[in-house]
Amino acid sequence: MLYSRESRTTVLFLALVTSLTVLCHSVDVTTVFTTSTITEITTVTAAPQPQNKAETALNTATNIIQTMQFLFNCAPFKWKGPLKITSCALNFIVLLLTAWGYLLKYLQENKLNSDADMEKMVGLGFGEMVGRIFGKGVGKAFTKMDITQKLVYPFEGSNRQKCLLMTVGENSIVPFHDLSTEICFDQYTLDSLSHHNHGSISILDAGSVSALGFADISSKMPSVSELYTLFGDYTIEVLGGITKLASTLNREDWQGERNGFAVLSRDRPNQTLLSVHMYSSSLL
């Protein structure tokens, strides 16, 4: 775990080196301008539809810096009471869902549609998997989280549901050791969730976002914008579930409970598009 001033310096130095590495090796120098705001609710941000390789690489460098900022916020020496720990939990859940969403997008874009393809990616390990999607520099930062993962199949069928199970190890910089996160979905989940009826994040009501506990976050903030890229018109439901889980992890007895949320289809109320549960590995 990180406690000393030397450790803090190491984290920031690694963020700088990895971001410069991506820029030096990936960016075809063109005129690209971007604005990024790092807030307490830090998340991985990227343009929904990058226009060129330079923009993609620049967004990847931003991902690295913000990922390291996330790690820095979660380190014990940065804790300042329950609010700080809740912020860390919120960041962590958003990050896991973002990584899962981009995994599915990566598989779709590369026409890797079989369960075997997904199992191969998951089998790489969390850090290496993220590195394959975003770049090696980002993957190295994620390796510090010491997360093991596997794909499980709770139900049989032609379009059977799959669950990505991710468990935090003892050496993780994330302070929720032995925490397992179970994200269950089917092959059509991402397309169903990311459908944008109105094509713009502006359709999200800022009041609805604030009512979930994000009083200082508008629908234009990076965390909400990134989630909207993946979850579209279902972003409010997902944010509500994330808030519930973050609150649960802030309690000392979270290890003894299984908590989660489900996103139901609006077109087919009996159909679950996505479910997310978090619990101690001892409950497996």
Curated annotation (Swiss-Prot):
Membrane-spanning residues: 85-104
Signal sequence residues: 1-24
Chain positions carrying an annotated carbohydrate: N270
GO cellular component: fungal-type vacuole; plasma membrane; prospore membrane
Keyword presence, Membrane: yes
Family of the protein in this entry: To yeast YNL033w.
Annotated protein name in UniProt: Uncharacterized membrane protein YNL019C
